[in-house]
């Protein structure tokens, strides 16, 4: 895996986490069924972040500690 790809994937994980957090906050502002739809979207974003994280881990990429902590707290 190239350094450029590692950098892009790490940046994308940060974006997926931010998206997850945004959709979760939005879901708390609505009643059903909108709440559930927004929560489901947040779950998808979390899944994307975890998949990218897993790919990097399989390639033995060392990740910043803050990113490790964010992933583990999701």
Task: Name the predicted role of every residue range.
Residues 1-74:
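Non-heme di-metal
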């Amino acid at each position: 895996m190239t350094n450029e790809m590692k950098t892009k994937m790490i940046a994308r994980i940060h974006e997926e986490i931010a998206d997850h957090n945004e959709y979760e906050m939005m879901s708390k502002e609505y009643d059903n069924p909108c709440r559930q739809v927004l929560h489901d979207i947040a779950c998808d974003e979390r899944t994307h972040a975890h998949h990218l994280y897993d790919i990097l881990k399989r390639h033995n990429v060392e990740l910043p500690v803050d990113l490790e902590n964010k992933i583990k707290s999701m």
